[in-house]
């Protein structure tokens, strides 16, 4: 979205995130069935000449070295859906919770610190911290590590669960409906 707007190719970009985790949950696995939720969210990003309203920067990253932390072993192209895949619950999401927690806190904290340092921002410059809504403990630990107050941090995971790609636009909407953001 940022690239389309900055290049002048588009004035408005609609960003949508949607997930239906209920279709890949093993409801006997307490490590995942209470965490994930279904949801969809969207945001319109528009061009502006006001620097205070502009997207400052974007950071996207992934690391395949941690593929075993959260995954589905079957139901895709490597192990297509079959009676065996379904019987063995290979199409259900599996997660190594403690390892995922540690990596998420470390990575998100570091990414935010790098972005703030890059743009010479302090905690006081950040009015709202709206992270991916993975887990309340992760959000709380990252917020504390970064020095953000509870008032700065938007949390919706306790309401909707981890809706993955939908979590940030849903959290933005929640904050908007509360009058916290414009």
Where are these regions (language model features)?
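Conserved active-site "lid/cap" helical segment
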Residues: 75-127, 138-146, 171, 175, ...
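Generic detector of short, locally flexible boundary/turn motifs and exposed helical patches
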Residues: 6-11, 19-21, 35, 88-98, ...
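N-terminal start-of-chain detector that recognizes signal peptides
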Residues: 13-18, 100-103, 159-162
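Short glycine-rich loop/turn motifs that provide flexible caps or phosphate-binding loops at active sites
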Residues: 16, 36-40, 75, 133, ...
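Claisen-condensing/thiolase-fold acyl-transfer catalytic domains that form or cleave C-C bonds
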Residues: 1-9, 105, 109, 127-182
